[in-house]
Amino acid sequence: MMKKSICCALLLTASFSTFAAAKTEQQIADIVNRTITPLMQEQAIPGMAVAIIYEGKPYYFTWGKADIANNHPVTQQTLFELGSVSKTFNGVLGGDRIARGEIKLSDPVTKYWPELTGKQWRGISLLHLATYTAGGLPLQIPGDVTDKAELLRFYQNWQPQWTPGAKRLYANSSIGLFGALAVKSSGMSYEEAMTRRVLQPLKLAHTWITVPQSEQKNYAWGYLEGKPVHVSPGQLDAEAYGVKSSVIDMARWVQANMDASHVQEKTLQQGIELAQSRYWRIGDMYQGLGWEMLNWPLKADSIINGSDSKVALAALPAVEVNPPAPAVKASWVHKTGSTGGFGSYVAFVPEKNLGIVMLANKSYPNPARVEAAWRILEKLQ
């Protein structure tokens, strides 16, 4: 009898730990505030907007100023520059193009840009561009490259440091070119394709590449060394770092990416899943199309340390996953993003139906963003 009682007690303990009581909105707010308020003070961030997706439902929180000079507060409608979180939109749009049969990741880059006649481009595929494994394309396209002719010259003159697929080196010039070439045969501009194929179907009505005049009042200023700034235009900027969005739209973006089964357009649904497929393994991290994934559960150190620029921007050996592994629900899926005056972070765990969006109008170190997100989600799981 004693043995049976102990077994029952153990089962009850396991049950309670597995099925913890659901958090109230106030409890969620307290957890978020206890992390974000000191973060803003430590990093001198003028304004932030955070969304929590908890049990599939979004909760929104805002702090501080979107425009210091005019004393405009951050609201749920405030537009923030996403920086490299824009790459996740690029990846999903590319996935939609693949699902439609309009491109293949195995296609050579030269199929879509025949003017690239340099021998170094032989053997480089769209997959290599999308996943930063072409052989060492640089982080940025030089600022003096200002038109299409100069862009072609830049890529023609580039010389790889490694064979395609040997190493991953994070680069706007890599995934940016993927985005541009992925839509080339559609007859649409990248912005038009993004709007029609991704933003409109997902009802992201406040997500922009070019912020229209009617939305300028909601466009936050970013702050760099205390001065207000907006991102400067550049070649392939839309594809690599050019999206602006609100916390409400970004929560909707996370919800769609966390569970694509509710997305009505089948090719977009497949595109979302393709963006979270695993194409390469780099240490503990798996590279998708825009998104980066780690197996869940995991230790905080692995994502916090991995987000540091010394690691994230380093050339690291890449191990091909062939065939690519489909999206894994037990994953920490995430992406950081920065422009001169903004810092963003998005992370979610599909298996837990749990996610976070952090938007700030100051760029601050990635590890601080990831650690804050981890602290919050750890208390909510």
Swiss-Prot record:
One of its GO terms (biological process) is response to antibiotic. Sulbactam is an effective progressive inhibitor but a poor competitive inhibitor. Transmembrane segments: none annotated. Keywords: Antibiotic resistance, Hydrolase, Periplasm, Signal. It catalyses: a beta-lactam + H2O = a substituted beta-amino acid. Changing S185P: In strain: GN346. Changing E150A: In strain: GN346. Residues 1-20 form the signal peptide. PROSITE patterns: BETA_LACTAMASE_C. Changing A368V: In strain: GN346. Its EC number is 3.5.2.6. It is found in: Periplasm. One of its GO terms (molecular function) is beta-lactamase activity. Changing A325V: In strain: GN346. Substrate binds at K335, T336, G337. InterPro entries: Bact_CellWall_Synth/Modif (IPR050491), Beta-lactam-related (IPR001466), Beta-lactam/transpept-like (IPR012338), Beta-lactam_class-C_AS (IPR001586). The active site is at S84 (acyl-ester intermediate), Y170 (proton acceptor). One of its GO terms (cellular component) is outer membrane-bounded periplasmic space. Changing R97A: In strain: GN346. NCBIfam families: bla_class_C (NF033085), CMY2 (NF000191), CMY2-MIR-ACT-EC (NF012173). This protein is a serine beta-lactamase with a substrate specificity for cephalosporins. The class C beta-lactamase family has a specific amino-acid numbering system known as SANC, for structural alignment-based numbering of class C beta-lactamases, or else the simpler name structural position. A multiple sequence alignment was used to derive a consensus sequence and then the consensus was numbered taking into account insertions and deletions. This allows use of identical numbers, e.g. for active site residues, despite differences in protein length. Belongs to the class-C beta-lactamase family. This is Beta-lactamase. It comes from Citrobacter freundii. The gene is ampC.
